[in-house]
Regions:
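Transmembrane beta-barrel wall of Gram-negative outer-membrane proteins
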Residues: 1-8
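C-terminal transmembrane beta-barrel domains of outer membrane proteins
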Residues: 4, 15-18, 35-179
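Flexible loop and strand-edge segments within Gram-negative outer membrane beta-barrel domains
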Residues: 11-12
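Alpha-helical scaffold segments in soluble metabolic enzymes
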Residues: 21
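Conserved helix-loop functional segments at active or binding sites
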Residues: 24-31, 134-138
Length: 179
């Protein structure tokens, strides 16, 4: 069964979206960067047509630098997003989810607001993620091009603007999760 919150969402939704992207890539290599940074900003506006009206923005920045030698590389990243409804409440497809590829160590949708009645992820109107990684040679022949890595990630999803029906047990825990 599905969450009562999700069942109460409007079934007939249409939207027209205009988006603006800004990407800056100053890495020394797109395959195995050792130095530089990459920044990506996206802003979307829905409301030029249809019955949905909202603004949704995301941003991500990652920096790379060598540690001790050029073969040991540290990368650090921060990512965030916000959804703002201009009228009505957000739907599941408009909200943010973390887990899987977006926060390693958690299943997709495993972080953030959740309907405990049916154990279903509801997503949130805001999210933030921080990542750090160190890659290093394994001492194998260079031709194999194999590296080891150690990473750490933390993130959270918060903000649920949906109406919660009586009898629905929602966990709005917005704790920072890490792996």
């Amino acid at each position: 069964t599905s969450s009562a919150i999700l069942k109460n969402e409007p079934s007939n939704r249409t939207s027209s979206i205009i988006a603006v992207n800004l990407n800056i890539d100053k890495r020394d290599s797109i395959i195995k960067p050792k130095r530089g940074y990459i920044v990506s900003l996206t802003s979307k506006y829905a409301g030029l047509g249809g019955n949905r009206e909202y603004s949704k923005s995301t941003g991500k920045g990652r920096i790379y630098f060598p540690l001790i030698t050029d073969s040991i590389v540290v990368s650090s990243e921060i990512e965030a997003g916000a959804l703002s409804m201009n009228n009505g409440t957000s739907t599941a497809s408009e909200r943010f989810y973390l887990g899987g590829r977006t926060l390693r160590g958690f299943q997709y949708g495993g972080v953030g607001p959740r309907d405990l009645t049916v154990n279903e992820s509801l997503g949130g109107t805001n999210y933030t993620v921080g990542r750090a990684e160190v890659s290093f040679p394994l001492g194998l022949p260079k031709e194999l091009n194999m590296y080891g890595g150690v990473f750490g990630e933390l993130g959270k999803v918060w903000g649920l603007d949906a109406t919660v029906p009586p009898g629905t047990n929602v966990n709005l825990d917005d704790s920072i999760r890490s792996s």
